[in-house]
A protein has these predicted regions:
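C-terminal PAP-associated
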Residues: 61-551
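Secretory targeting signatures
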Residues: 1-63, 538
């Protein structure tokens, strides 16, 4: 471009200027100047307004997002209400056992090997659930089962595999070397045939009753072995003086357990030798022996909260000083606790709610304890409060009873810790451990009266799960998972999708030990070899957005 062209563009010949009108002023400014300033202000204000509106929209979006975040973490008081106390720092890992496993039992030997017993199989993991192998003996142990149970003696490390053979008898086999070799008795159910709902446990000998015999037999086996079962109208309990090889001492427990049908939960024992059996009855009750099963007495509690119908097993755990903790599902479907500090002679009568009020339906409470006041409870539960009052499987307004739960109810696995359960104002720390449901819809809680057959019977989970701690005070949980595969990934799974019974183990990775001396347990090293299948699943302790919980 030439200089002349530039001059022609920039210069105006004054002779050719024509004024159409005389400019007027607005104050000290000309009209043109005022208009320019007004346009600038308009643009500036619109920019500011846009920024404000955008910020408001962003904040609204952020608030909306926070409202649907579900942490699955609760800290509650003795009424189940939230309190302003920091939650315990803990994380759980899970592991698929790879086998069907309704009614599982779990135990841990001093070597760290985990034994998961369900149906006729004994599954062992010595690498904290990275891998599992079947270890029961094909000759010494039962090839089939009608009802399974397992137990690891925390004193001797003996592993018991108990299998009911029809209703006639039970076949018990045992191992003293982490399942490498086994011995068994195919007719090991006491002096009287016909048994059901079998349970086994071990505990110290006392100085009275059968303990007088046990004191002489400790060279044969250090602890007493108890075997209880239901037979028609009552509970029968036997005591073995030879490590469970035979059960010659004992018989029927008389009293309330007999008059109410006799179904019962797990056997529990305390360091002082006290034995507890929990009958499945309307008023929460514990049957107690302080002489190794020679005699029994019963104690009731929980009349302020009652029990639902149909009802499942309650359970007792005991701590290192023989304090006892009885947990059960109340009539309002919460998990409740009564405590005894005198070996079962007396129990607190004002029931304590263990589960958060947000968990409105529960089943299968299982418990274990470490040092005084330090115990854990696991259970299945639902937070679908919005479904309360909707039509249940019988067409009545649903009140939280899992037996009649509508199809939209999702049950998850929970664990609750307390480190001060003996205090007047205990604190409960609860975590939801599953990110997809364990069961969708109703759980059959009465074997002769299942209400749903969508996709098959909803009796798939059977009667119980299990929880035990190891020598470090680390919590291990065994469950049957009814919602696996496609069911676990669907946005809206149905009851028909939820008919599995896959064995799953949940284990405290890091967090508080139930033994004070061990403090907070560090993470477990679960490094898997390259040829292992993906059975080990870390449960990441982060907030997750899900649609199957209520606000």
């Amino acid at each position: 471009m030439s200089d002349e062209e530039i001059l022609e563009a920039e210069l105006v010949d004054s002779a050719e200027e024509t004024l159409l009108a005389t400019p007027t002023n607005i104050g000290p400014l000309s009209r043109i100047q005022a208009l320019a300033i007004a346009l600038v202000l308009l643009l500036l204000s619109s920019t500011i307004l846009y920024a404000i509106l955008s910020t408001k929209e962003t904040l609204e979006e952020e608030v909306s997002e926070v409202l649907v975040v579900d942490t699955g973490i609760f800290v509650t008081n003795s009424s189940g209400m939230s309190i302003d106390i920091p939650p315990l720092d803990m994380k759980f890992n899970s592991s698929s056992v790879g086998e069907d496993a309704a009614e599982p039992s779990i135990g841990i030997t001093s070597s760290g090997c985990i034994f998961f017993i369900a149906f006729e199989k004994v599954m062992r993991s010595c690498d904290y659930g990275v891998s599992w192998e079947e270890v029961q003996d094909p000759v010494q142990c039962a090839p089939t089962t009608s009802d399974p149970y397992g137990w690891v003696d925390p004193v001797t490390d003996r592993i018991f595999n108990v299998q009911m053979m029809g209703l006639e008898t039970s076949w018990i086999c045992w191992s003293d070397n982490d399942g490498q070799t086994w011995f068994g008795n195919p007719h090991d159910s006491g002096t009287t045939p016909i048994n059901d709902h079998i349970k086994l446990a071990t505990g110290p000998w006392t100085n009275s009753g059968y303990g007088l015999i046990g004191q002489l037999s400790q060279n044969a086996y250090e602890t007493a072995v108890y075997y209880c079962y239901n037979k028609l109208a009552g509970i029968f309990c036997y005591t073995s003086i030879d490590g469970g090889a035979t059960f010659e001492l004992g018989g029927q427990i008389i009293g309330l357990a007999t008059t109410n049908g006799g179904l019962h939960g797990a056997i529990s024992t305390a360091p002082d030798g006290t034995v507890y059996v929990t009958p499945r009855v309307e008023t929460p009750t514990v049957i107690v022996s302080d002489d190794n099963g020679f005699s029994w007495f019963e104690r009731t509690m929980g009349e302020d909260v009652g029990t639902p119908y149909p009802r499942k097993n309650s359970e007792v755990s005991t701590d290192s000083e023989s304090n006892a903790y009885h947990v059960w599902t109340g009539a309002d479907e919460g998990i409740y606790l009564a405590k005894s500090t005198d070996s079962g002679e007396s129990w607190t009568q004002e029931s304590i709610r263990v589960s958060p009020v947000e968990v409105i339906s529960t089943a299968f409470p299982q418990t274990d304890a470490g040092d005084p006041g330090r115990f854990a409870v696991t259970y299945l539960g639902s937070e679908n409060a919005s479904i309360l009052g909707e039509s249940d499987l019988d067409g009545n307004p649903w009140n939280g009873n899992g037996h009649y739960a509508p199809n939209g109810v999702h049950y998850h696995l929970y664990v609750t810790f307390s480190l001060n359960a003996l205090d007047d104002e205990p604190v409960f720390h609860t975590r939801r451990l599953t990110t997809d449901p364990v069961q969708v819809g109703a759980i059959c809680l009465n074997s002769g009266d299942c209400r749903s057959d969508q996709g098959g019977s909803n009796r798939n989970l059977l009667d119980f799960n299990d929880l035990h701690i190891d020598r470090e005070g680390r919590v291990f949980i065994a469950i049957a998972d009814g919602c696996t595969g496609e069911c676990a990934t669907k946005e809206t799974p149905t009851p028909a999708d939820s008919r599995d019974k896959l064995g799953m183990m949940f284990m405290l990775d890091y967090g508080p030990s139930l033994y004070v001396a061990n403090g907070d347990l560090p993470p477990i090293n679960t490094t898997a070899s390259t040829n292992q299948s993906n059975v080990f699943i870390p449960i990441i302790d982060v907030e997750a957005i899900r649609e199957d919980y209520d606000d």
